[in-house]
């Protein structure tokens, strides 16, 4: 799927931040009276972990080919011999030696947009694991391209605008053919940040049938949407995907989450080998400002869509040393410091993730990929003090090759108001949306975390990385952490519970998800499990609180960084739109690929503690928990 995800930090209005029960998403769509949750389709993906895959392959008398893409293709053909499909052009080999290949099912030459197959090939060239959400029902016998009885794309655009109450003027819209089958771009519209687009695709419906739809793409700033409008009835919308997920320098150094944890210090040349051009060059041009290969940071007080000519601090000698005081007001009075801090945190996280394997081929955010794979020209556009909102943040993740966009807002929860850029955990949470959306389903598909449970895990991954990075040497497994506490001016933070290994402090279990209906609530459950997992690995391997992990044969040598690496590797292994059980299995498979399952029982025990143990089962309305361990543990 040509996808983009907009993820936000919060899902509740600020007047209820202190309440333990989070409310529905307070994004721009909901302010227009549109409930995007009502358009989410249920999870359909299946995942065959490495153990099950080995048995399956043996039963099929399946042999590998010389090329990992050919081996993966052979598996898809063997699994669905009557289906047609195409190889998505985003395959790569990760730093753990696993090859990742993605496929899209087709019908009559058109994509079935939510029908995906991902195959993971091991170092030995054999199938390691795989997952799929292929359509298994009856393909329509009639080729729609023969009679062409479907509506034109302009009607679909108008249908999307009307159904979602979008601020797009489409009265004079005209469709212009672009590259690709039944692919169009709209001229004569206003209100969108870029020209809306439409593609004719099939979509699996909840009732098990296919619908011919126009996938209408509209970027309206706070929402970057793929709206699936019925191709025979433009008033019917079957599904909506939102790409925006509601994340010398004088800065708060890496590891300091917010101003309560320390003071700004001067840091010289903080980049690592992950940024060979430094943070101020893209390999072609050197920039005396907060711009480089990985990110471009600026203020955006009007909340507008343009950025290239926005204000950013200039320093010919690259000394970004600006004043800040906790009593300074308004936030615009220290915008130089704010932009510098945002630029620093974004680049620092880029470099850490690169060391774990989120590199060019995996779809990271860089202008110049240096002939290392992937699609370039897609640094992260990061806006400080963005005027399009308050008390929140978001990150838009289009597919590889298009820039990500982060909007960081001011928070009106304290006097003086607080700047979200100064809470590193919020920036990290937002950037982690870019990570998970590029890895899950492949760099070319940003629509693989758009179901309720998978979207919840997207929020959970953001909280997990934000929390893992802020750990201090004095911390133990009994240390509890909040999320967003400084910005929200609330020591309990913005989640229902603190992140804690204590079941009394945080009672969330796998079956808690049965009663939750919002992605940030579900994400808190997932991040809680990952917090337990991290501490289990720290107890097994020790903890290091240095800024950069130490690797031996590609394996981080401490439990904290090992947890971050395994969680990230699991994202690339799991199927499009996974559930908790599949994501757990993918982390176990990630450990098998990286350490030959050296941490298998440690991982199982951590998940079993929260009811996601051996025998736990997924059902959208009645998940079954288990505290059991598998044989051998």
Curated annotation (Swiss-Prot):
- Organism from which the protein derives: Arthroderma benhamiae (Trichophyton mentagrophytes)
Q: Which InterPro entries match?
A: FTP_domain, Fungal_virulence_M36, Peptidase_M36, Peptidase_M4/M1_CTD_sf
Free-text function comment from the UniProt entry: Secreted metalloproteinase probably acting as a virulence factor.
Instruction: Could you list this entry's UniProt keywords, alphabetically sorted.
Output: Glycoprotein, Hydrolase, Metal-binding, Metalloprotease, Protease, Secreted, Signal, Virulence, Zinc, Zymogen
EC nos: 3.4.24.-
Q: Which cofactor does it need?
A: Zn(2+)
Top enzyme class of this protein? hydrolase
- What are the boundaries of the signal sequence? 1-18
Tell me, what is one Gene Ontology molecular-function annotation carried by this entry?
A: metalloendopeptidase activity
Keyword match Secreted: yes
Residue spans crossing the bilayer: none
What Gene3D superfamilies does the entry give?
3.10.170.10, Neutral Protease Domain 2
What Pfam families does its record include? FTP, Peptidase_M36
Predominant localisation class: secreted
Domain of life where this protein originates: Eukaryota
Annotated residues that bind Zn(2+) are located at: 429, 433
Which family, according to UniProt?
A: Belongs to the peptidase M36 family.
Its protein name is: Extracellular metalloproteinase 3
- Catalytic machinery residues: 430
Gene Ontology CC annotation, any one: extracellular region
Tell me the GO BP annotations in alphabetical order: proteolysis
User: What positions does the record give for glycosylation?
Assistant: 410, 480, 622
């Amino acid at each position: 799927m040509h996808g983009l995800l907009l993820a936000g930090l919060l899902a509740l209005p600020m007047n209820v931040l202190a309440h333990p029960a989070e409310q529905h998403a307070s994004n721009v769509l909901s302010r227009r009276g549109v409930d995007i949750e009502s358009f989410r389709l249920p999870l359909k993906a299946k995942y065959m972990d490495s153990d099950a895959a080995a048995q399956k392959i043996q039963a099929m008398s399946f042999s590998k080919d010389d090329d990992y893409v050919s081996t993966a293709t052979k598996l898809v053909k063997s699994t669905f011999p009557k289906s047609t499909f195409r190889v998505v052009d985003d395959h790569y080999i990760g730093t753990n030696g696993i090859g990742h290949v993605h496929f899209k099912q087709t019908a009559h030459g058109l994509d079935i947009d939510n029908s995906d197959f991902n195959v993971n090939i091991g170092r030995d060239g054999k199938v390691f694991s795989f997952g799929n959400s292929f359509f298994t029902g009856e393909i329509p016998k009639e080729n729609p391209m023969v009679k062409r009885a479907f509506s034109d794309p302009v009607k679909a655009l108008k249908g999307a605008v009307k159904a979602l109450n979008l601020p797009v003027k489409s009265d004079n819209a005209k469709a212009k053919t672009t590259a690709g089958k039944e692919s169009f771009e709209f001229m004569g519209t206003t209100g969108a940040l870029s020209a809306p687009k439409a593609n004719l695709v099939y979509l699996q419906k909840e009732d098990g049938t296919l619908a011919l739809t126009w996938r209408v793409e509209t970027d309206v700033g706070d929402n970057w949407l793929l709206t699936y409008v019925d191709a025979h009835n433009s008033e019917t919308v079957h599904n909506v995907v939102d790409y925006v997920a509601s994340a010398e320098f004088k800065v708060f150094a890496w590891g300091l989450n917010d101003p309560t944890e320390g003071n700004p210090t001067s840091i010289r040349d903080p980049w690592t080998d992950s940024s060979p051009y430094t943070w101020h060059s893209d390999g072609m041009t050197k920039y005396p400002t907060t711009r480089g290969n990985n990110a471009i940071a600026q203020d955006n007080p009007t909340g507008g869509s343009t950025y290239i000519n926005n204000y950013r601090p200039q320093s010919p000698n690259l000394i970004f040393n600006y004043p800040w005081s906790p009593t300074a007001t308004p936030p615009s009075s220290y915008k130089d410091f704010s932009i510098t801090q945002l630029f620093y945190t974004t680049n620092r996280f880029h470099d850490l993730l690169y060391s774990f394997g989120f590199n060019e081929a995996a779809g990271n955010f860089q202008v110049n990929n240096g002939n290392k794979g992937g699609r370039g020209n897609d640094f992260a556009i990061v806006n400080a003090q963005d005027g399009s909102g308050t008390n929140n943040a978001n990150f838009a993740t289009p597919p590889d090759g298009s820039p990500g966009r982060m909007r960081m807002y001011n928070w009106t929860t304290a006097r003086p108001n607080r700047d979200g850029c100064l809470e590193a955990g919020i920036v990290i949470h937002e950037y982690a949306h870019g990570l998970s959306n590029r890895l899950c389903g492949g760099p070319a598909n940003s629509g693989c975390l758009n179901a309720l449970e998978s979207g919840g895990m997207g929020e959970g991954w953001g909280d997990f990385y934000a929390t893992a990075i802020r750990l201090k040497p004095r911390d133990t497994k009994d240390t509890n952490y909040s999320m967003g506490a400084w910005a929200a001016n609330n020591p309990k933070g913005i989640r229902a519970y603190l992140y804690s290994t204590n079941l009394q402090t945080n009672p969330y279990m796998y079956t808690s998800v049965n009663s939750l209906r919002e992605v940030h609530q579900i994400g808190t459950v997932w991040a809680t499990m990952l917090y337990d997992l991290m501490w289990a690995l720290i107890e097994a391997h020790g903890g290091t609180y240095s800024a950069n992990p130490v690797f031996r044969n590609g394996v981080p040598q401490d439990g904290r960084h090992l947890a971050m690496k395994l969680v990230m590797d699991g994202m690339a292994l799991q199927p499009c739109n996974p559930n908790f059980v599949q994501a757990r299995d993918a982390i176990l498979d990630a450990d098998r690929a990286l350490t030959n399952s050296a941490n298998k029982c440690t991982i199982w025990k951590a998940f079993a503690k929260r009811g996601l143990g051996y025998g736990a089962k997924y059902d959208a309305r009645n998940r079954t928990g288990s505290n059991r361990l598998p044989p051998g543990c």
